[in-house]
Amino acid sequence: MATPAKVIEILSAEDLRRTLTRLASQIVERTRDLSQLVLLGIYTRGVPLAELLARQIETLEGINVGVGALDITFYRDDLDQIGLRTPAKTSITLDLTGKTVVLVDDVIFKGRTIRAALNAVNEYGRPEVIRLAVLVDRGHREVPIHPDFVGKQLPTAKEEVVKVYLQDWDGRDAVELVGY
């Protein structure tokens, strides 16, 4: 990849904290029974985001919600373009039948990752409802998928990249827009 021409901070650590609090509040408001809520983070950055949202929901409501990690490697429709990758480990320890599942991802772009995640979820039961929470929605969909919960709407050029940094994974919290 070429050297970035510009890097713009979109969310600072404090902005990210506020955004996660707002997302958690919205999820709580739209969930009829929090005891049936399961947050499924999509590898890679969706996993720690799901954990952060679960902690925030516990802070807000005093309830532990289910959290899992979803690897979509074998459900992707672009394996011929990106090549086979070593799959991460899906970690879903409960039957999703009848649950309110919120898929969590860092950035939604074309929508293809979420399409693959929807296919993968069916391997673990039939949820009552599946919703989608994303930290950043940058537009440019290629499939008709729309998130239910959005931290930040960020119109971008197709060649720009949104980078999400999380303390537990990267040593800092931030969201940046990188232009080339």
UniProtKB/Swiss-Prot annotation:
Q: List the disulfide bonds.
A: none
UniProt keyword list: Glycosyltransferase, Transcription, Transcription regulation, Transferase
Entry binding sites for substrate: 44-45, 85, 105-113, 138, 162
Q: Where is this motif: PRPP-binding?
A: 101-113
Record's catalysed reaction(s): UMP + diphosphate = 5-phospho-alpha-D-ribose 1-diphosphate + uracil
InterPro entries, A to Z: PRibTrfase_dom, PRTase-like, PyrR, PyrR_bifunctional
Q: Which HAMAP family match?
A: PyrR (MF_01219)
Describe the task this protein carries out: Regulates the transcription of the pyrimidine nucleotide (pyr) operon in response to exogenous pyrimidines.
Q: What is this protein called?
A: Bifunctional protein PyrR
